[in-house]
């Protein structure tokens, strides 16, 4: 048997990797001056936001009016909208805001024309807007008894701002008389992203044509917030609750359209922020549409996708009567879970099936707990260590299987030579050898299969976890995005126009791992030249595809592979003894072995195939 010893080159490689990591950590620590500069920058940004809010309030107090001297323009306007010309065409906006969200509602159309998230900025330090500069439109289309087809965007609403306890209430009325009107009523609670939105009317029975449906029309272009528009676009899509609490979504990569029934809510998700419309009674039907606006990576493109929803509504006794809610806020499970009765947390892309379950009930709460008292990057490292410790029994089983196969290698090679011209006989004798030795060639695959759900769950967790958004670690300024350390003057297909460091470290670690698990056996077993190709291909694929992925995921795989390597080294050098394994296998060969059902079935199938082969030759 070969003498067990540590490869000095492998040890040197590990030491160098840790040395680089420690140096990068020390090198990238912000200085006290940099921390002070960041604090000053944030204070300037908050002051600018406050100044803008105050200026907006002053604007509301003194609304700008249409030039009423132009009698022809006024007459034309009143002629077009008929009875709703009672309300004076007064331009202006009203502000609703609390500590988390800022809204501006326009007199024209009565709709929200600006929605800003307080406390959040984009990758280039601009406040996060979900609605701005006409990117969104909400309107009701209806017919009147005098055969006009009106759109609420063409109507002027009269604003009245009041208080209901601690809540702010904005009543927007498009009047046909002093006591007859269409009303949009917004109600904002302190420190909440959910806005109550009621549409009702009074005295419009006979003015609105009740024989024709009301059409709700909601459109939005999703504003870009991240440094990679392609990456953000991958997680920007329409999600909706329908048909008995089923959660569905439109395609994220191409134009898509669906008509659904019993729709409870519609979410326009912009990666880490969402605009959601809920309806208390459920929409009977809703036609949903999504158009992809991103064809390639761009640093100047403003919008990622264009969304649209068309919903028919019925009048209630000849009047408007609909209870909605607007949600403008982060796609954060901690926030959305506050509205359990609406089920808005289901709009978060946890993943499907068991992968979503693992993300939602294991990784999300564990990471939330760890990051509550640890730096965000360190929390990932600790979570990785916990996962690897939990999976260490599977790692042990995998390495034990490899050790047994290594001990049997000379006998397998002998069988390959003896039956090189008879593949079926070679397979039968190999299976017989495994059975006698008490070795299962599939035992090494089972641990890998057990880890697959974790792999795919993490693939969704890191790029969509709001807790990681704009959280720095070492050289990475955002663990939910890529960690570019160099910008290229050109774009490499599939790779990008930048170089990310964590994917490089993860690729190096997985290369060493594959060297340990496949490198020693790749030249002597049949088919192993292909394994050498895979050993080089896997790290290369990680390097290429993870270059534009969440740096938190690359950090996880870097640390995970390092831990796995050290666990396997410990198992190899301090736990498993190949001499004992060899002796155990030889002892197993002496014992009578009874075929299990699977082995018996496999043997019978191979014998039948052999018989058919012989018959074919005759």
Language-model region placement:
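Helix-loop-helix
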Residues: 1-59, 105, 199-202, 217-232, ...
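Short, Gly/Pro- and small/polar-rich lid/capping loops
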Residues: 54-91
């Amino acid at each position: 048997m070969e003498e067990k010893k540590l490869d000095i080159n492998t040890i040197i490689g590990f030491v160098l990797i840790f040395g680089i990591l420690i140096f990068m950590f020390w090198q990238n620590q912000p200085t006290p001056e940099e921390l002070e500069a960041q604090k000053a920058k944030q204070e300037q940004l908050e002051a600018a936001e406050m100044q803008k809010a105050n200026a907006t309030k002053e604007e509301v107090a003194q609304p700008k009016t249409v030039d009423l001297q132009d009698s022809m323009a006024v007459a034309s306007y009143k002629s077009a909208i008929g009875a709703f010309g009672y309300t004076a065409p007064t331009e202006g906006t009203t502000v609703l805001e609390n500590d988390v969200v800022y809204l501006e509602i326009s007199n024209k159309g009565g709709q929200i024309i600006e929605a800003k998230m307080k406390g959040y900025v984009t990758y280039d330090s601009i406040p996060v807007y979900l609605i701005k500069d006409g990117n969104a439109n909400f309107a009701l289309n209806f017919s009147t008894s005098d055969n006009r087809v009106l759109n609420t965007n063409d109507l002027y609403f009269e604003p009245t701002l009041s208080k209901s306890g601690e809540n702010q209430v904005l009543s927007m009325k498009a009047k046909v008389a002093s006591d007859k009107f269409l009303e949009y009523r917004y109600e904002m609670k302190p420190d909440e992203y959910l806005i109550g939105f009621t549409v009702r009317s009074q005295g419009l029975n006979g003015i609105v044509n009740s024989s024709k449906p009301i059409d709700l029309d909601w459109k939005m272009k999703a504003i870009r917030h991240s440094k990679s528009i392609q990456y953000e676009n991958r997680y920007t899509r329409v999600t909706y609750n329908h048909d008995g609490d089923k959660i569905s979504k439109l395609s994220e990569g191409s134009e898509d359209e669906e008509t659904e029934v019993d729709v409870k809510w519609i979410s326009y998700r912009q990666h880490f922020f969402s605009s959601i419309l809920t309806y208390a009674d459920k929409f009977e039907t809703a036609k949903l549409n999504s158009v992809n606006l991103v064809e390639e990576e761009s640093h100047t493109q403003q919008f990622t996708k264009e969304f649209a929803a068309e919903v028919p509504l019925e009048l209630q006794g000849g009047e408007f009567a609909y209870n909605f809610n607007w949600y403008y806020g982060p796609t954060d499970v901690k926030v959305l879970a506050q509205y359990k009765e609406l089920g808005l947390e289901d709009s978060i892309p946890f993943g499907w099936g068991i992968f979503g379950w693992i993300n939602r009930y294991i990784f999300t709460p564990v990471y939330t707990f760890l990051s509550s008292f640890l730096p965000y990057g360190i929390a990932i490292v600790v979570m990785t260590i916990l996962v690897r410790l939990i999976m260490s029994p599977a790692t042990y089983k995998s390495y034990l299987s490899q050790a047994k196969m290594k001990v049997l290698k000379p006998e397998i090679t002998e069988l390959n030579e003896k039956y090189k011209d008879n593949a079926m006989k070679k397979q039968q004798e190999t299976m017989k050898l495994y059975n006698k030795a008490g070795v299962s060639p599939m035992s090494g695959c089972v641990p890998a299969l057990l880890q697959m759900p974790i792999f795919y769950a993490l693939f969704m967790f890191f790029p969509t976890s709001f807790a990681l958004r704009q959280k720095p670690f070492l050289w990475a300024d955002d663990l939910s995005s890529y960690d570019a350390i160099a910008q290229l003057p050109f774009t490499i297909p599939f790779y990008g126009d930048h170089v990310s460091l964590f994917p490089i470290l993860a690729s190096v670690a997985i290369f060493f791992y594959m060297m340990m698990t496949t490198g020693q056996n790749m030249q002597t077993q049949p088919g192993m030249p292909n394994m050498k190709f895979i050993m080089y291909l896997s790290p290369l694929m990680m390097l290429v595809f993870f270059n534009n992925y969440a740096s938190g995921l690359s950090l996880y795989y870097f640390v995970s592979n390092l831990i796995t390597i050290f666990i396997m080294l410990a198992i190899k050098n301090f736990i498993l003894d190949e001499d004992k394994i060899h002796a155990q296998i030889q002892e197993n060969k002496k014992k009578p072995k009874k075929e299990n059902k699977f082995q018996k079935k496999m043997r019978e199938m191979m014998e039948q195939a052999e018989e058919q082969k012989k018959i074919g030759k005759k």
